[in-house]
């Protein structure tokens, strides 16, 4: 075997057969992590607030779940509860986190949950903890020009987040910072993934917050689109990114997970191309000002590790098809389509 090939093989050495703890296993991203980990041969221990809740039933139907998936009831704010879940695991994917702009519900639970997972990981001597942070911890800085590429060295301005009452971004930033501090103190190998807005097929039966972002343009509830931009990434790519940074010994630090940024006008154009039968808005709510320029997010670090991103158009198409297949979005009949077009 050539030296380069041997080195590559060693770098991505098979670690299937290991047990990975996935927190908040029933969530949108976490469900995909569980699915892909099982497909790769891992044993998965998923933490949930209530494993018996019907909304988590999809996990038990995943391929390999019967043999290699255990769902455990865990309160992430109870350190002993977290320790029990992590004990005996080789790695942890910490994905569970509140998604809210209520500061009391967002900040403290996110910070304490992250700390508890790192402490539990240290005690269990796990090989690596992979923490799902967010682009919200990275790009909120009024002093950074939109023309400057946002990369892993960037952090959100906490005072700006507080001033604008963006408690989601504030909570994500302080939770990630706390995770880094505790990991350093406890000697835990921590790697962080910072995804942008995540879309793609739903595995869970409920609609998640990011999917509502698309749904409103298809149901007719949004009559116009905003003069705003958003970066997108496929949920499968986010799950793969976590597995990649867990498996690659050389992975370290933070990894921005973004495919591309679109203006809302570009977003609705793609939706209208694939799904012309829906009442997708064609006018911007702000036609006086020039189009807002999108942020430029670097995804070089993940690409260098070998991640191939799914094109945003494919991601949007699969998101809508999933909403249709699960009954969250009705499919208009021909008469409705003609009415929309006229």
Curated annotation (Swiss-Prot):
Q: Which residues bind NADP(+)?
A: 24-30, 49, 55, 75-76, 95-97, 168, 172, 195-198, 210
Identify which residues the record assigns to the active site: 172 (proton donor)
Pfam families xrefs: Epimerase
Q: Which UniProt keywords apply?
A: Cytoplasm, Disulfide bond, NADP, Oxidoreductase
Where in or outside the cell it occurs: the entry states:
Cytoplasm
Tissues where this protein is expressed: Mainly expressed in roots and stems, especially at the sixth internode and, to a lower extent, in leaves and flowers. Localized in vascular elements, with weaker expression in the interfascicular (xylem fiber) region.
Q: Briefly state the modifications made to the protein after translation.
A: The formation of a reversible disulfide bond reduces activity by perturbing the positioning of nearby catalytic residues.
Instruction: State the Gene Ontology BP annotations.
Output: lignin biosynthetic process; phenylpropanoid biosynthetic process
**Pathway assigned to this chain's UniProt record:** Aromatic compound metabolism; phenylpropanoid biosynthesis
Top-level taxonomic group:
Eukaryota
Gene disruption phenotype: Drastically reduced growth and lignin content, as well as death after flowering.
Q: Which reaction does it catalyse?
A: (E)-coniferaldehyde + NADP(+) + CoA = (E)-feruloyl-CoA + NADPH + H(+); (E)-4-coumaraldehyde + NADP(+) + CoA = (E)-4-coumaroyl-CoA + NADPH + H(+); (E)-sinapaldehyde + NADP(+) + CoA = (E)-sinapoyl-CoA + NADPH + H(+); (E)-cinnamaldehyde + NADP(+) + CoA = (E)-cinnamoyl-CoA + NADPH + H(+)
Provide the top EC class.
oxidoreductase
Described function: Involved in the latter stages of lignin biosynthesis. Catalyzes one of the last steps of monolignol biosynthesis, the conversion of cinnamoyl-CoAs into their corresponding cinnamaldehydes. Mediates the conversion of feruloyl-CoA to coniferylaldehyde. Also active, with a lower efficiency, toward coumaroyl-CoA, caffeoyl CoA and sinapoyl-CoA. Involved in the production of floral volatile phenylpropanoids in flowers of fragrant cultivars from cinnamic acid, a common precursor with the anthocyanin biosynthesis pathway involved in flower pigmentation.
As for family, the record states: Belongs to the NAD(P)-dependent epimerase/dehydratase family. Dihydroflavonol-4-reductase subfamily.
**What name appears for this protein in its UniProt entry?**
Cinnamoyl-CoA reductase 1
Question: Which organism is the protein's source?
Answer: Medicago truncatula
Give the taxonomic lineage as stored in the record: Eukaryota, Viridiplantae, Streptophyta, Embryophyta, Tracheophyta
């Amino acid at each position: 075997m050539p030296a380069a090939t041997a080195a590559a093989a060693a770098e991505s050495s098979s670690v299937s057969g290991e047990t990975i703890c996935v927190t908040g296993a029933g969530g949108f991203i976490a469900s995909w992590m569980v699915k892909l980990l099982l497909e790769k041969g891992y044993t998965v221990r998923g933490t949930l607030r209530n494993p018996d809740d019907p909304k988590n039933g999809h996990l038990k139907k995943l391929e390999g779940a019967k043999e290699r998936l255990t769902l455990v009831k865990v309160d992430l704010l109870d350190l002993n509860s977290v320790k029990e879940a992590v004990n005996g695991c080789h790695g942890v994917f910490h994905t569970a986190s509140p998604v809210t702009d209520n500061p009391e519900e967002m900040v403290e639970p996110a910070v304490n949950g992250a700390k508890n997972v790192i402490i539990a990981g240290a005690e269990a001597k796990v090989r690596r903890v992979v923490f799902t942070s967010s682009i919200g911890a990275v790009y909120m800085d009024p002093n950074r020009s939109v023309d400057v590429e946002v990369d892993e060295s960037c952090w959100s301005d906490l005072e700006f987040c507080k001033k604008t009452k963006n408690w989601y971004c504030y909570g994500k930033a302080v939770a990630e910072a706390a995770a880094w501090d505790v990991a350093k103190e406890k000697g835990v190998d921590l790697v962080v993934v910072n995804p942008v807005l995540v879309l793609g097929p739903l595995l869970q039966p409920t609609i998640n917050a990011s999917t509502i972002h698309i749904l409103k343009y298809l149901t007719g509830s949004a009559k116009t689109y905003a003069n705003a931009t958003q970066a997108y990434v496929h949920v499968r790519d986010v799950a793969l990114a976590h597995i990649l940074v867990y498996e690659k010994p050389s992975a370290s630090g933070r990894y921005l997970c973004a495919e591309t940024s679109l203006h809302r006008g570009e977003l609705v154009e793609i939706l209208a191309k694939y799904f012309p039968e829906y009442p997708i808005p064609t006018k911007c709510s702000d036609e006086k000002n020039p189009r807002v320029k999108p942020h430029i997010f670097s995804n070089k670090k993940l690409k260098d590790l070998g991640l191939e991103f799914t094109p945003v158009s494919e991601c949007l198409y699969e998101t809508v098809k999933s909403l249709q297949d699960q009954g969250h979005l009705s499919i208009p009949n021909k008469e409705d389509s003609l009415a929309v077009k006229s």
